[in-house]
């Protein structure tokens, strides 16, 4: 086996362990690239001197819980909660007693009669990829890891999803998420609105009807609906 092939095999094996086999088939080569090596080293160093969220075993949960071949919807977030509630899924909280304001507004838009668990794994298991564009953060410092290389990896993730033959619904809330719209082919439905944060939800997120639209879209194609 050539040195290049050996490196490629090692990168693929690391990817399988990190993001699961179906994602590794599309993103495995990223793990041999210098930016990913630098990113890994930076996070390792950061964890030695700072509290970093989410916990190491949760960083890639979006990939592990929603395999590539199961992705039907993508909801794009920014970075994890910096208060210890991050579980690796965008907008989700692992603390049952902590429902962030953005998530409260999401639940309100869905129309929940009663507040449900803030853990959104139930969505991820149905094919909703809850992907932050930055997968780690320092405690108490939002966007603190926004320039260490994560965006390159999540950009490659979006590119790989864009290549799917089966249309994927992309939900892009707010200006940050909408920057990625230009990289998504028109064959994929794209839903946009202001972010569900308390500062912008009343400017068009409320009443956007995205959750109903998604399920109507799946009904039209005889696909299973998402149980939001």
PLM features: residue spans?
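A polyanion-binding, active-site-adjacent surface
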Residues: 22, 29-172, 176-184, 188-192, ...
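A charge-rich, low-complexity, intrinsically flexible signal that marks solvent-exposed coils, linkers
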Residues: 1-4, 8
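Generic N-terminal amphipathic, Lys/Arg-enriched alpha-helix
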Residues: 9-10, 14-27
């Amino acid at each position: 086996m050539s040195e290049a092939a050996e490196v490629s095999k090692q990168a693929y094996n690391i990817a399988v362990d990190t993001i699961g086999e179906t994602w590794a088939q599309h993103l495995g080569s990223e793990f041999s690239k210098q930016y990913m090596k630098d990113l890994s080293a930076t996070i390792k160093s950061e964890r030695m001197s700072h509290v970093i969220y989410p916990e190491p075993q949760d960083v890639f949960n979006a990939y592990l819980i929603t395999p590539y071949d199961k992705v039907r919807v993508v909801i794009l977030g920014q970075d994890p909660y910096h208060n210890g509630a991050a579980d690796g899924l965008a907008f989700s909280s692992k603390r049952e007693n902590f429902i962030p304001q953005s998530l409260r507004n999401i639940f309100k838009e869905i129309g929940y009669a009663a507040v449900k668990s803030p853990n959104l794994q139930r969505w991820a298991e149905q094919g909703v990829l809850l992907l932050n564009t930055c997968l780690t953060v320092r405690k108490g410092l939002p966007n603190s890891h926004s320039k260490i290389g994560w965006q390159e990896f999540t950009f490659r993730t979006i590119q790989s999803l864009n290549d799917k033959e089966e249309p994927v619904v992309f939900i892009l809330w707010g200006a940050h998420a909408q920057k990625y719209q230009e990289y998504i082919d028109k064959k994929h439905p794209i839903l946009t609105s202001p972010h569900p944060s308390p500062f912008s939800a009343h400017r068009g997120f409320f009443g956007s009807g995205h959750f109903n639209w998604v399920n109507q879209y799946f009904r039209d194609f005889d696909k299973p609906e998402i149980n939001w």
